[in-house]
Amino acid sequence: MTGQRIITDAHYPLSELTSRIIACSIEVHKTLGPGFEEVFYQRALHRELCAADLDAVREVEIEVRYKDLALGKKRVDFVVEDCLVEIKAKAHIDDVDVVQTISYPKASGYPMRLLINFGGPKIEIKRLANTRTSKPNPREGA
């Protein structure tokens, strides 16, 4: 992440953290460009996040619950400190991607989610806030 300026906005929860994640993502997109499969962007982003001294865990399973019933588990691409990060590599983010990113981690308790699409000529990023506050430790498993 060379020369990226971190811009924060107090209107967004975890603005500094998400700005750092976004700066790492921009570096990956600038270097690789569009056209690769998601896994390549995940690997490159993980390297950038670690180089930026962010605690990033890849391929985290979170538990999906209905009230007190555990329904199963769903994998998210990253947990970066207090933020869930979903990666896409397609022409554009569509409504289904946004709904999916909002819905299945809703019960996770992470205050912020980022949806990042590397597939187009310009990187697309959506910040999605979660109002729940308690979250599991991704290193302990769900």
Model regions: which residues?
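Solvent-exposed, charged helical/coil patches
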Residues: M1-D55, M112, I123, A129-A142
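Amphipathic alpha-helical interface surfaces
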Residues: L17, Y41, L45, V80, ...
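Nucleic-acid endonuclease domains
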Residues: F36, A51-D53, K73, V98, ...
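A short acidic/basic microdomain associated with nuclease active sites
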Residues: A52-D68
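Well-ordered beta-strand positions
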Residues: V57, D77-V79, N117
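Short beta-strand or tight-loop elements
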Residues: V60-I62, K74-V76, P121
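Active-site beta-strand-loop-beta-strand hairpin of nuclease catalytic cores
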Residues: G72-E86
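Nucleic-acid nuclease catalytic cores
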Residues: L84, K88-P136, E140-A142
